[in-house]
Amino acid sequence: MLVVPAIDLFRGKVARMIKGRKENTIFYEKDPVELVEKLIEEGFTLIHVVDLSNAIENSGENLPVLEKLSEFAEHIQIGGGIRSLDYAEKLRKLGYRRQIVSSKVLEDPSFLKSLREIDVEPVFSLDTRGGRVAFKGWLAEEEIDPVSLLKRLKEYGLEEIVHTEIEKDGTLQEHDFSLTKKIAIEAEVKVLAAGGISSENSLKTAQKVHTETNGLLKGVIVGRAFLEGILTVEVMKRYAR
């Protein structure tokens, strides 16, 4: 099972937004480049980096940080405001192959195929709040059945998703794996679970679901609990495979 540390960037700094709300932003006095380098040295093979400024405000203020982080691009899945082929290609030229996309894919599913044509490995971000699918930096929502949506996107080459429970994101509440498990099994896609991966109990449950889904639950993304030391690097490594 993959355990993926998460680093969100806002105003050029490491940050977390509780439930995805800008007014509930927590900033951390951590250097993002040093943090990523240390995690790779500790043996983590994948780091989740999201440009919140670009996702929410369509701002390029974090680009200098992304350029510095590109040294470690092979270990990073990058997301946040990837809504055009031009921007995806710009990130690809920096070395970022694994890119997280959402809003543009909901508007135009063929975007998945277009990304593969420029050697990008797209990962769809399925963000849910109370059973509704959210997009545009979680500022908009729509009543869409997640499983039906994913089955349709598979026709365009979808293979893997990140499923975030927005109501749990950044709250340190426990992730409810029942919906994540249902999505993985019924849609037959690989899933990284996010939002509420907040304790060792979360990791134990994830490991159990990983086995029950024959690996379709590929792993978990750990954000605030990691940044605040609630889940230490040592504990996360214990569950990482």
UniProtKB/Swiss-Prot annotation:
Coiled coil: none
Catalytic residues, chain numbering: 8 (proton acceptor), 127 (proton donor)
A GO CC annotation given for this chain: cytoplasm
InterPro entries: Aldolase_TIM, His_biosynth, HisA_bact_arch, Isoase_HisA-like, Isoase_HisA-like_bact, RibuloseP-bd_barrel
Keyword Endoplasmic reticulum tagged: no
EC number: 5.3.1.16
Keyword terms of this UniProt record: Amino-acid biosynthesis, Cytoplasm, Histidine biosynthesis, Isomerase
Quaternary organization: Monomer.
Protein name per UniProt: 1-(5-phosphoribosyl)-5-[(5-phosphoribosylamino)methylideneamino] imidazole-4-carboxamide isomerase
